Amino acid sequence: MSSSRRSRQASSSSRISDDQITDLISKLRQSIPEIRQNRRSNTVSASKVLQETCNYIRNLNKEADDLSDRLTQLLESIDPNSPQAAVIRSLING
């Protein structure tokens, strides 16, 4: 079997159907608050859903970073041997 034929087969087997894409977009519509709050969320285009999903994920990452920074600052301000410090360390280290 030629290399290009194997590539085409691997590529086609990893593709998802239009129905699967539609289902995934629908699940994203239900998951993203900015879209879910829109009364006409079913009319929002797939590209808009993907754009809002990316924005939402970026915002979540920023919030997680901010919370981690705040926990680090809090940890620096308390007794490192206290039970609270142990809890904060467990939150920071996941």
UniProtKB/Swiss-Prot annotation:
Residue ranges of every copy of the bHLH domain listed in the record: 5-60
InterPro entries membership: bHLH_dom, HLH_DNA-bd_sf, PRE
Location(s), subcellular: Nucleus
Keywords recorded for this protein, A-Z: Gibberellin signaling pathway, Growth regulation, Nucleus, Transcription, Transcription regulation
Tissue: Expressed in roots, leaves, stems and flowers.
SUPFAM superfamilies: HLH, helix-loop-helix DNA-binding domain
GO molecular function: DNA-binding transcription factor activity; protein dimerization activity
Pfam families: bHLH_ILI
Keyword DNA damage set for record: no
Assembly: Interacts with HFR1.
Miscellaneous field: Plants over-expressing PRE2 show long hypocotyls, pale green and slightly narrow leaves, elongated petioles and early flowering. They are not sensitive to the gibberellin inhibitor paclobutrazol during seed germination.
Classification via PANTHER family: TRANSCRIPTION FACTOR PRE, TRANSCRIPTION FACTOR PRE2
Function as written in the Swiss-Prot or TrEMBL entry: Atypical and probable non DNA-binding bHLH transcription factor that integrates multiple signaling pathways to regulate cell elongation and plant development. Regulates light responses by binding and inhibiting the activity of the bHLH transcription factor HFR1, a critical regulator of light signaling and shade avoidance. May have a regulatory role in various aspects of gibberellin-dependent growth and development.
Protein name: Transcription factor PRE2
